[in-house]
C-alpha cells in the first residue's frame, strides 16, 4: 500500500464557509457532517450540529440532542484549532448527564476553530467558529 497523507478534494460551500476551511472538502456530508452538509442525516442537523458560543477565550459547546441513556446519546465534544490539533475534549456519560454541554477556557489560541459533536448513532458533526 501507499503510506502518506490523504488528499480531500474541495466541494460546494455555503457563502459563509471560506474556501480554505477544513469544512471545504468532499468529506463534509460523507465522513463527517455539518449544518450545511448533513449528507444522509439531513433530518438530524438541528439536533446534532454543535452550537458554539465563544467570548474572550471562553468557549461553550452545546448539542441540543437529548441524552437517552446508552441507546442514543452524544458521546463527546472535541475542539480543534485551524490545523485540526485537539485543544479540548469532553466525554459524556449519558447515565450521569442530561445534556451535552461542555465549557473550555482557551488562553493560548485565537482564530478559526472547530467543534465536533459525536453521536453514538448519527456520526460526527462539525461546526466552525472563531475564538
Where are these regions (language model features)?
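Transition segment at domain starts
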Residues: 14-58, 91
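Generic detection of short hydrophobic beta-strand segments and adjacent strand-loop junctions
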Residues: 90-92, 104, 127-131
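Short acidic/polar inter-strand loop motif in beta-rich domains
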Residues: 118-128
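N-terminal export signals
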Residues: 1-16
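Short, surface-exposed ligand- or partner-binding patches at beta-edge/loop junctions that are enriched
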Residues: 110-120
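Contiguous segments within soluble domain cores/interaction surfaces
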Residues: 41-42, 55-92, 96
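Exposed aromatic-hydrophobic patches
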Residues: 60-64, 99-108
Amino acid at each position: 500500500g501507499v503510506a502518506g497523507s490523504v488528499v480531500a478534494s474541495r466541494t460546494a460551500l455555503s457563502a459563509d464557509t471560506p474556501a480554505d476551511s477544513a469544512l471545504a472538502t468532499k468529506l463534509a456530508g460523507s465522513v463527517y457532517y455539518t449544518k450545511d452538509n448533513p449528507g444522509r442525516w439531513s433530518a438530524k442537523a438541528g439536533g446534532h450540529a454543535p452550537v458554539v458560543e465563544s467570548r474572550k477565550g471562553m468557549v461553550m459547546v452545546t448539542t441540543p440532542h437529548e441524552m437517552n441513556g446508552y441507546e442514543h446519546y452524544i458521546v463527546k465534544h472535541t475542539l480543534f484549532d485551524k490545523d485540526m490539533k485537539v485543544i479540548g475534549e469532553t466525554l459524556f456519560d449519558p447515565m450521569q448527564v442530561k445534556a451535552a454541554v461542555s465549557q473550555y477556557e482557551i488562553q493560548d489560541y485565537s482564530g478559526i476553530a472547530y467543534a465536533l459533536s459525536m453521536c453514538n448513532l448519527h456520526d460526527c458533526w462539525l461546526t466552525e467558529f472563531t475564538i
